[in-house]
Amino acid sequence: FGYIYVEWQSDEDSVLNGFEFLTKDHVSKSSMALVITTYNRKEAVTKTINRINKTLLTQSEFKDRFKLIVVNNGEAINHQSGNGIMVINNENLGGSGGFMRGLIEARKINDVKHVIFMDDDGSCEIESICRTHAFLLMAKDKNTVVTGCMLFEDNPAIIHESGAIWHRDFLHYPDKHYLDARGIDSLDTFDNERKIGYGGWWFFAFNINAIEYYSFPFFVRGDDLLFGYMHKKHNIVTLNGVASWQMDFERKISVLNSYLNFRTVAVPALISKRKFAALLLSVFFVREVFLASFSCRYELARAMIMSYNDCLSGREFWEDNVDLLEIRKRINAITHNEKFNVEGIDIINGCVDYPCSGKEKAIYKFFRCITLNGHLIPAFFLIKKPIVVDYRHYHPTKF
C-alpha cells in the first residue's frame, strides 16, 4: 500500500470543508453480516443491538447493506429476530462455536458476501464497520481480510495489538504493541505493514468464499488464533480508523484462563510440520510453569500442568470435553487462593489504595529464587508479611 493525500495551498482566504476520493471501478452491491457471539451479557448485547439497529440497519443509506446475526450461548435475550436482525439460541460451545454458527447462518443469506466477527459490547465506531465494508467491496483478492486493532479501554490511545505475528508456528506476539496512536510519527509506524498471522475476533472481517475450514467448536482461549492458523492464505491488513476498545488481557489472568491459554498454544504446535515444534512446546511449557511458580501463582502453574497432560491425551479427550463442565470442576478443585476477579472492577472510574512495599531488591530476589520462594528454608526465618503485587506482574523478576 502507498499513500494518497491532498496538498492544499490557498492563494486567498478560503475554507476547506472536506474532500473525497472517487473511483470508476466496479463495486459489488453485496451485503455484510455482523456476527456477534454472547454469553449471559444481556445488558451489553442489548445495547449493541439497539445501537447498530439505530445507526446502521434503519438508515436508508445502509439498511440494505448490513445484517446483524447475534448468536446467544447463554440465557434468552429479550429481542426478536426481524428487520435485518437474527437472534439465534445456541449450545454454549464458547466463542468458537458461537462464531462458527453465525458464519454458517450468514452463508444461508443470498446477498451476504462478507462477514465481521465482533464482540458483544460492540466497542467500535460505526464508521469502522462502514469503512471495512467499503474496503472489502473494492478488494481484488478474495483472501483479503481486515482486522481491527485493539486499543486499551482504560487507555484508549494506546494500541495493544494491530494484528499478531506468528513465531515458529505456535508462539505469537502482538504487532504495534503499546504504540501511542496520538503521535504524528505513529501514523507512519501504524501503516508499516507486516505479515500478519491472525487477527482477533473483536473485529475480524473477511470474504465468506475465503473460508476453507470451520474452527473446532470447543472452549479455548484464543480461538481466533487457531482460525488464523488454519487460513494461512489470508492476506490480513489493518486500516486507519478501524479499531476496537477492549479490556487489558493481563487483567484476565486466572487459573481457568491459563489452562485454556496453554491449550491454544499447544494445538498449533502439535499439528505443525515444523521440525522441533513439539520440543519447543515442551521448553515453553517448562518456562511458563517456572514463571508462574516463582510468581507464587502455584494454582495457575498446576492448571498449566493439567492442560499439558490433557493436550497429550489424544483425540478422545477433545471429543469428550467439547464443553467445559468437567474441566471447570477440576479447575475449581485446585483453585482456592487465586480466585480474585479483576474483570469486574471499574478501573476507569474507581481506584483502591494499597500500601506499597517498593520494588524487590536484587539480593532478595536472588535468595528468593535459589530457595524456591523460601520453600527450602525453615519457616521461622521468613517474615510473614503480605505484599501487594500489581496484577501485571506475572513475571517474577518484575516484583
Whereabouts are the PLM-identified features?
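Conserved donor NDP-sugar-binding/catalytic core segment of glycosyltransferases
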Residues: 127-173
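Short beta-strand-to-loop acidic/aromatic patch adjacent to the donor-nucleotide binding site
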Residues: 111-123
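A recurrent flexible, glycine/aromatic-enriched loop bordering the glycosyltransferase active site
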Residues: 177-203, 252
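Acidic donor-binding segment of Leloir-type glycosyltransferases
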Residues: 51-88
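Terminal low-complexity segments of carbohydrate-biosynthetic enzymes
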Residues: 1-3, 8, 263-399
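Donor nucleotide-sugar recognition loop
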Residues: 198-203, 212-229, 234-239, 256
